[in-house]
């Protein structure tokens, strides 16, 4: 079985010009806010667009040309702040700056609300990203966390305990450690009976396989985590055999239910409910230009984070455009910035 995480890219990637299918919400993803009249000031200055805020990412797309779009996963975000930017539609105005890192490349995004006086651009994105950051226990494998209090599992907001199994040996050491299993709707938690701080929390999101395998301690429950977390193999000994089989059956069943509709743990309620994402995304009309999928261009370089830039570069006259523009960085051409990434 493949883990949900191995197929999940929405919160863990920055992508440009995604397909209409990729703009749709995946299972467990929910649209939280929709903001019209938002300008992508860095990459598409002067182009009015729409910003969609989900529990996993933000999506911006041009209203005039929906295939011009971008998707920014919250896990890629390094910093969010507000600064003054120069917008073609608003002039000098306060904008949302988002610094990200994806595949060892830093991208910077600047979003400006074309409609003056509305703080929702800032409040929605910042608040939802904070909710994502504070709910990592739903999504990340955690060792030695503050999981247990008075021998009881400290429940997450959307969590329910389905089973508690005593007498479970953790096989991570030569002699093993006796402890207790908690099986919930979002994760499996084990802690040592003699030391509650010796524990592990394994979200279903991270689980690649659950099976019974032979070990030096005899048959054991073996959990393999996703490749993105390093592919950990965790072994647990449960006696008698029928108790072990029941535990594996129960965990596999709950993992299957979770995989069909994951709980990512990001909770944020808007006063006004947005329309479903399918109704908001504009169907991309076919055009008569064929784009070769294997042909890569550098259109996304407009979003590269320019860490040394403190001020706008001096204006220079562009013969190609017939007007003054900010001087391009070395190695960049107007032609390269106009090309659409395939």
From Swiss-Prot:
<dbReference type="GO" id="GO:0060271">
    <property type="term" value="P:cilium assembly"/>
</dbReference>
<dbReference type="GO" id="GO:0034464">
    <property type="term" value="C:BBSome"/>
</dbReference>
<dbReference type="GO" id="GO:0034451">
    <property type="term" value="C:centriolar satellite"/>
</dbReference>
<dbReference type="GO" id="GO:0007369">
    <property type="term" value="P:gastrulation"/>
</dbReference>
<dbReference type="GO" id="GO:0032266">
    <property type="term" value="F:phosphatidylinositol-3-phosphate binding"/>
</dbReference>
<dbReference type="GO" id="GO:0001947">
    <property type="term" value="P:heart looping"/>
</dbReference>
<dbReference type="GO" id="GO:0046907">
    <property type="term" value="P:intracellular transport"/>
</dbReference>
<dbReference type="InterPro" id="IPR006606">
    <property type="entry name" value="BBL5"/>
</dbReference>
<dbReference type="GO" id="GO:0043010">
    <property type="term" value="P:camera-type eye development"/>
</dbReference>
<dbReference type="GO" id="GO:0032402">
    <property type="term" value="P:melanosome transport"/>
</dbReference>
<dbReference type="GO" id="GO:0005737">
    <property type="term" value="C:cytoplasm"/>
</dbReference>
<dbReference type="Pfam" id="PF07289">
    <property type="entry name" value="BBL5"/>
</dbReference>
<dbReference type="GO" id="GO:0060170">
    <property type="term" value="C:ciliary membrane"/>
</dbReference>
<keyword id="KW-0472">Membrane</keyword>
<dbReference type="InterPro" id="IPR011993">
    <property type="entry name" value="PH-like_dom_sf"/>
</dbReference>
<dbReference type="GO" id="GO:0072116">
    <property type="term" value="P:pronephros formation"/>
</dbReference>
<dbReference type="GO" id="GO:0062139">
    <property type="term" value="P:camera-type eye photoreceptor cell development"/>
</dbReference>
<keyword id="KW-0963">Cytoplasm</keyword>
<dbReference type="InterPro" id="IPR014003">
    <property type="entry name" value="BBS5_PH"/>
</dbReference>
<keyword id="KW-1003">Cell membrane</keyword>
<keyword id="KW-0969">Cilium</keyword>
<dbReference type="GO" id="GO:0070121">
    <property type="term" value="P:Kupffer's vesicle development"/>
</dbReference>
<comment type="subunit">
    <text>Part of BBSome complex.</text>
</comment>
<dbReference type="GO" id="GO:0036064">
    <property type="term" value="C:ciliary basal body"/>
</dbReference>
<dbReference type="GO" id="GO:0051877">
    <property type="term" value="P:pigment granule aggregation in cell center"/>
</dbReference>
<comment type="similarity">
    <text>Belongs to the BBS5 family.</text>
</comment>
<keyword id="KW-0206">Cytoskeleton</keyword>
<dbReference type="InterPro" id="IPR030804">
    <property type="entry name" value="BBS5/fem-3"/>
</dbReference>
<protein>
    <recommendedName>
        <fullName>BBSome complex member BBS5</fullName>
    </recommendedName>
</protein>
<keyword id="KW-0966">Cell projection</keyword>
<comment type="function">
    <text>Required for ciliogenesis.</text>
</comment>
